[in-house]
Amino acid sequence: MAVVKKKRNVVVGRVHICATYNNVIVTIADQQGHVLVTTSAGACNFKGSKKSTPYAAQETVARAVKAVIERNGMKTVSVCISGPGAGREAAIRAVQACNLNVTSIKDVTKLPHNGCKLPKRRRV
């Protein structure tokens, strides 16, 4: 279930989507960065390996956006997406399908400049 903070009228906001290999986390905030709604695929009753699917990302974003439109009356958003997960494109498409004006889509995935050593590869 989406966690909704206060009820106040916010027309313009930001949607932060973190799509990892294991989960999808969606946070919707106003322009100042105050969080209005946050939810994840696990909170939307997707368990185990189903949390990282594109369908889970789509449903998670749809629930969060629906909650913020009902509660805060949001109309325009900019999307910031991070992480290498499978649900990236599905999450962006879900935001665009929810009757919100998307002003910008920004990829804020952090890339190392040869930083820490990666985990060893799985041998199956």
From Swiss-Prot:
Located on the platform of the 30S subunit, it bridges several disparate RNA helices of the 16S rRNA. Forms part of the Shine-Dalgarno cleft in the 70S ribosome. GO terms for cellular component: ribonucleoprotein complex; ribosome. This is Small ribosomal subunit protein uS11. The keyword Membrane does not apply. InterPro entries: Ribosomal_uS11 (IPR001971), Ribosomal_uS11_bac-type (IPR019981), Ribosomal_uS11_sf (IPR036967). It comes from the Bacteria. It comes from Anaplasma phagocytophilum (strain HZ). The lineage of its organism: Bacteria, Pseudomonadati, Pseudomonadota, Alphaproteobacteria, Rickettsiales. GO terms for biological process: translation. Pfam families: Ribosomal_S11. NCBIfam families: PRK05309.1, uS11_bact. Part of the 30S ribosomal subunit. Interacts with proteins S7 and S18. Binds to IF-3. Keywords: Ribonucleoprotein, Ribosomal protein, RNA-binding, rRNA-binding. GO terms for molecular function: rRNA binding; structural constituent of ribosome.
